[in-house]
Amino acid sequence: MTARRPTRFAKGELNVYRAPRDVTDVTRALRSTGRRVVLVPTMGALHEGHLTLIRAAKRVQGAVVVVSIFVNPLQFGAGEDLDAYPRTLDDDLAALRAEGVEIAFTPTVGDMYPYGTRTSVHPGPLGDDLEGASRPGHFAGVLTVVCKLLHIVRPDRAFFGEKDYQQLVLIRQMVTDLNIDTRIVGVPTVREADGLALSSRNRYLDEVEREQAGALSAALLAGMYAASNGAAATLDAARAVLDEVPAIEVDYLQVRDPMLGPVPHEGAARLLVAARLGQTRLLDNIAVDIGASDGIDGHPRVGSPDHQLPWRN
């Protein structure tokens, strides 16, 4: 039986691997030289939001950044067109080269699930709430693929955007509950000039819908300003903005604690919205401070002279 050749890695270049074993071998070798392996999981169709995650990952001292590009079929449910999801691998790899990324992991479905989908990670009760109520099985698919990526790459840290906030909370829950030795880093949402959260789905909006979509971020800001008056006032203010755009079909608008438990009487919380505009489903969220005259952890409250808005509408 012949020995397996070491997988090639060229420092300072973009190295593209499809086989999970190749990525495992290369990252293990890099760790042995003192490099810190960090992971940015994506489904491709890269935009400025993804690039912001990559830049945050590159700031880790001694980091070698692994970006995975994999359209995961497990997280698509009935009525969600997996085949229609944008696949722009050549453009994505060009963007990674421009950012100085050294490893791209681009497996096929067969590479990731060679024995089918016989084992999965169950997200628990939170997986059936909020997004999970509208997309049964979605978070089991997300956690399964993220768990596999963390075991394949063995990163010191993995970076995820706060736009998909429930996903971020569930991944942190999984890493804690399954004793996975990776630090999960949340990165603030990247937005367009009018506040719309960057998303691969935004390309499906027509010109009129794109203008209307700005109401989601406007609603979040209205809720954030009203939060000193309590959770009900937060929701009322946000809902009033959304009601001005009848084309927006709201799925949910809720205030929860930062771990998505019941809303606190006072203190740090999260305002979350999901809505459909035409054929496009949009998500957004923002941190709010419920019912307190001072800001969270001593920061100025929204509306105070010292407060800086996260974006302008």
Swiss-Prot record:
Pfam families xrefs: Pantoate_ligase (PF02569)
Protein name per UniProt: Pantothenate synthetase
InterPro entries: Pantoate_ligase (IPR003721), Pantoate_ligase_C (IPR042176), Rossmann-like_a/b/a_fold (IPR014729)
SUPFAM superfamilies with a match to the protein in the record: Nucleotidylyl transferase
Chain positions recorded as beta-alanine binding sites: 75
GO biological process: pantothenate biosynthetic process
Keyword set includes Cytoplasm: yes
EC number: 6.3.2.1
Gene name of the record: panC
